[in-house]
Structures are given as structure tokens and as C-alpha cells.
């Protein structure tokens, strides 16, 4: 029987806090379930909603000025959400409401509210790069890799983009400047800061407080537009979350990384924004070309890739003094694949102190083998490399999340061989190891190459797990 508690049964202060929050006397079950939430409930109850409404209105005026909604509508949506618990009787939903309201009252001002106050002066730090000089070289490199055969019968998943992306991008530009210790960007927008001719869609980010930021942003969009916003977590992408609207249109996504990982990611400073070092991004691009899907993307829009490649090549030429003369030495390093055990052996002794690298195509197998080695010095760089690295007895052990392309039966395609070399170089950059000679040889090994057809490719490692999501409208959190 679900009875209401009387005021003599429970401590008066706790009961009063819960009663004030719910706008009613709690049931016995509600009381016992919510009494440990009284601290959060108190913060929500005393939170100044008027100041919060003002901050959201300012955010709307600055970043969403073209969205047709009135100040009174915004206020009504905010007050409605902060009183939602009074009409909710499901304990699970009450916990969700408390958790999300707690995020708003404790973090919104410092994360998004601060974007409305006067910003520090922008420190202009751009260098003039001669990207045009690299366009022909980039085109030649990419042309030799444009070997994917498009299966016209293959059904491609559609990536629907919200009309709010341009508004969120405007907000993100300011966010990246204000929070440049905890949030950095990579991808097309970061290269646009170097070369304004680059086209970009949404802004790709790495940050240390991704979940909190995305929740705050989701509510900002909800309060301004009135739309139901959903946050999704994808199991096969590490620490990745995406915001979509009620029609499944993509708004923004983010990878979360630890602060110690953030500290070692190579980055450069442009106009008060930190971007992932384009050298590192170039290595990631070379690595990703081992993925058959990425080669299919190249086949569909080579000019998009050419603009990015030329920008990064000019950056490494200017920054590292790379000479593009075709001298490749021992690049790409020799790669031998064991297709049955799904391990590639890369001969590294010509460049590094470890004599070889065992590249696993199944992450669970690598984890098991590392345990068997009884070694505890592995480095996990999370989504930055999608892999751990371990050097033990002069052998590097690592995981490669992409496909391996074969040019013949049992023979690693040179595109994948370069991708594996790039994967090893990412580790060198992250650990401040030597990489420049290897980088020079790797880039020169991409020059003047003939197209080599793809014979076959390995399958990607299958990732398991359930999708997580936060549905604000339905008060559901599943993680």
C-alpha cells in the first residue's frame, strides 16, 4: 500500500525539502528513494531560474538569432521543465529529472552561460601557408590511392544534418576559445583555420567533459527551439556521444578523453583555439585510408580530400622542413600478415629501438596477450588512436581498428602498410619520441606511385555492446 508519510514519521527537514520540490507530500516509497538526493534537490530548489532564463535568452540572441521563438516561449519552456517533477510519479523518471536538472544548475553558467560575457581579445597567430604549391603533389598521392571499386548495390546509411548545425558551429567557435584547456578541435574546421578555402560541416571536437557539455547544449537547443533533443552513445566508438533532434538529424558529436590524454595530444594555437597538430592529423588520414569505406569516400569526392591533404602537406613542409624529393629509404616498413590469427608483423628496426611491432586486428586478443605478458606499462590513448600500445622486450604490441587491404593473397597492400606505419608514428608523437625522419620517408613513399588494385581486405573487429541514450522529453537515461 502506497501511503503518504505523516510529518512525525520522518525528519522534518528532509521531508520538507522533498515536499517543496515535488509540490506535494511524497509517498513512503518516494521519500525513501529520494532522501539521498536531498542535497541535489536543494540546489535545484534554490537555483535562480530568472538568471538562468536571462542567460538562455542571451545565448539565443548571440548564437540562434535566426530561430523564430519569443522570449516568453523560452521562459515558459524553462519553467515547465523545472516543475516537471510535480507531475511525475515514476521513481525512475524522477531520478532522471533530478540528475539532468542538477547538471543544469551546477554547470550551465560556467560552460555555456559564460559565452555571453565579453571575450578576451583574440591573439592573432596565423601563419601564411602556400597551400597551392602542394595541390598537385596531394592530387598525385591521392590519385594513386583512389582504387576502391564502388558497389552500386551497397546501401549507404544517410547522415541527415540538422539546420541548426550552423548555429551550433557559431557557438562552438566561441566555446573553443573560452574552454581551450578542456576542448580542442580537429578535422575540416581546424584545417579551415589554416586554409580558409577548406569546406567544413560540423566542428569535430575532443574534450574532457563531453557528457556535461552535451547535456547543457541539448537543453539550450530544447529551450530555444522547443524540439525534443536526444543524446546517443555508440558502443563501437569509444567515449563518443552525439546530439540529434527528434527527426534523427545530426547536430553535433564529441569524443571524451581523460585530462592526461588531452595533455599529450600534439596541438597548435590559432586565434585562441587549440587544434590537433596537422602533422598528427595527416598521420591519422594516412592511417584511415586503410579503411575500405574511407577509400570509397575518396572515390566519391577526391577534391575534398585534396584540399585537406594539400593543407596538411604544406603545414609539415613549413613546420618540419620536409623535402619532397621521393627519397623513401625503408618506407613503408615491411608488413607480413597472419590472416588466420589476424596479426600483422611490422619490421621497425630500421627506425626505432623496438625491432618489430605486432599489430592485432582483434582488440580482445591483444588485451588477453598483454595480460599473459604480465606487463603493466601499456599506454591507452582512448579515441585519439583507438588503441593501446605496449613495448615489451623490444617488441611493440598494438591494436589497429581499420581494415587491412591486400594487393594479393597474403600480401599487405602498400596503402595499409603506410597506414600501419602512420599508426606507429602516432605513438611516437604522443610520447615525444623521434618521428621526423620516419615521417619524411613515409610521405615520400606516397609520391610517384602507380595504382595497385585491391585484391581483398580483412574485416574490422566486431564491437559489442548496447546503445545508450538520454531522452530529455521522456525522462529516460540508458547507459
UniProtKB/Swiss-Prot annotation:
What is said about its interaction partners and assembly?
A: Heterodimer of a large (catalytic) subunit and a small (regulatory) subunit.
Function, as annotated, reads: Polymerase that creates the 3'-poly(A) tail of mRNA's.
Its induction, per UniProt? Expressed in the early phase of the viral replicative cycle.
Indicate what this protein is called per its UniProt record.
Poly(A) polymerase catalytic subunit
Organism, as annotated: Variola virus
Q: Which family does it belong to?
A: Belongs to the poxviridae poly(A) polymerase catalytic subunit family.
**Which positions are annotated as binding Ca(2+) 2?**
202, 204, 253
Mind telling me which InterPro entries this protein's record contains?
Answer: PolyA_pol_cat_Poxvir, PolyA_pol_cat_sf, PolyA_pol_nucTrfase_Poxvir, PolyA_pol_nucTrfase_sf_Poxvir, Poxvirus_polyA_pol_cat_C, Poxvirus_polyA_pol_cat_N, Poxvirus_polyA_pol_cat_N_sf
Catalyzed chemical reaction(s)? RNA(n) + ATP = RNA(n)-3'-adenine ribonucleotide + diphosphate
Q: Give the EC number(s) listed in the UniProt record.
A: 2.7.7.19
Amino acid at each position: 500500500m502506497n501511503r503518504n508519510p505523516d510529518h512525525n514519521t520522518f525528519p522534518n527537514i528532509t521531508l520538507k525539502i522533498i515536499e517543496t520540490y515535488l509540490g506535494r507530500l511524497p509517498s513512503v516509497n518516494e521519500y525513501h528513494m529520494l532522501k539521498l538526493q536531498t542535497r541535489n534537490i536543494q540546489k535545484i530548489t534554490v537555483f535562480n531560474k530568472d538568471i538562468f532564463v536571462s542567460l538562455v535568452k542571451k545565448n539565443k540572441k548571440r548564437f540562434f538569432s535566426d530561430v523564430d521563438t519569443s522570449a516568453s516561449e523560452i521562459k515558459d519552456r524553462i519553467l515547465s521543465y523545472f516543475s516537471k517533477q510535480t507531475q511525475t510519479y515514476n521513481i525512475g523518471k524522477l531520478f532522471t529529472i533530478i540528475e539532468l536538472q542538477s547538471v543544469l544548475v551546477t554547470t550551465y553558467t560556467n560552460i555555456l552561460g559564460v559565452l555571453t560575457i565579453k571575450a578576451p581579445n583574440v591573439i592573432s597567430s596565423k601563419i601564411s601557408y602556400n597551400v597551392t604549391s602542394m595541390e598537385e603533389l596531394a592530387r598525385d598521392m591521392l590519385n594513386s590511392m583512389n582504387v576502391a571499386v564502388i558497389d552500386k548495390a551497397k546501401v549507404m546509411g544517410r547522415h541527415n544534418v540538422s539546420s541548426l548545425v550552423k548555429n551550433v558551429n557559431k557557438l562552438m567557435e566561441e566555446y573553443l576559445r573560452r574552454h581551450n584547456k578542456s576542448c580542442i578541435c580537429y578535422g575540416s574546421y581546424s584545417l579551415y583555420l589554416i586554409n580558409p578555402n577548406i569546406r567544413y560541416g560540423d566542428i569535430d571536437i575532443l574534450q574532457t567533459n563531453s557528457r556535461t557539455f552535451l547535456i547543457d547544449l541539448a537543453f539550450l537547443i530544447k529551450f530555444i527551439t522547443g524540439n525534443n533533443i536526444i543524446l546517443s552513445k555508440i558502443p563501437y566508438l569509444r567515449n563518443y556521444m552525439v546530439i540529434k533532434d527528434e527527426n534523427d538529424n545530426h547536430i553535433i558529436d564529441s569524443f571524451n578523453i581523460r585530462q592526461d590524454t588531452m595533455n599529450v595530444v600534439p596541438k597548435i594555437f590559432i586565434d585562441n583555439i587549440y587544434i590537433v597538430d596537422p602533422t598528427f592529423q595527416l598521420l591519422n588520414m594516412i592511417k584511415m585510408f586503410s579503411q575500405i569505406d574511407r577509400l570509397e569516400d575518396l572515390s566519391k569526392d577526391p577534391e575534398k580530400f585534396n584540399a585537406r591533404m594539400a593543407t596538411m602537406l604544406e603545414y609539415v613542409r613549413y613546420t618540419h622542413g620536409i623535402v619532397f624529393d621521393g627519397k623513401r629509404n625503408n618506407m613503408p616498413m615491411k608488413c607480413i600478415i597472419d590472416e588466420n590469427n589476424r596479426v600483422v608483423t611490422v619490421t621497425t628496426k630500421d627506425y626505432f629501438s623496438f625491432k618489430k611491432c605486432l599489430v592485432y586486428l582483434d582488440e580482445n586478443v591483444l588485451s588477453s596477450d598483454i595480460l599473459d605478458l604480465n606487463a603493466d606499462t601499456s599506454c591507452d590513448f582512448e579515441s585519439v588512436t583507438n588503441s593501446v600500445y605496449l613495448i615489451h622486450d623490444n617488441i611493440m604490441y598494438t591494436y589497429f581498428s581499420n581494415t587491412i587491404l591486400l594487393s594479393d593473397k597474403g600480401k599487405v597492400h602498400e596503402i595499409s602498410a603506410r597506414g600501419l606505419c602512420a599508426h606507429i608514428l602516432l605513438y611516437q608523437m604522443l610520447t615525444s619520441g623521434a618521428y621526423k625522419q620516419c615521417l619524411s620517408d613515409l610521405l615520400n613513399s606516397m609520391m610517384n606511385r602507380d595504382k595497385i588494385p585491391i585484391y581483398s581486405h580483412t574485416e574490422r573487429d566486431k564491437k559489442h555492446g548496447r546503445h545508450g541514450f538520454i531522452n530529455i522529453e521522456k525522462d529516460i537515461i540508458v547507459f
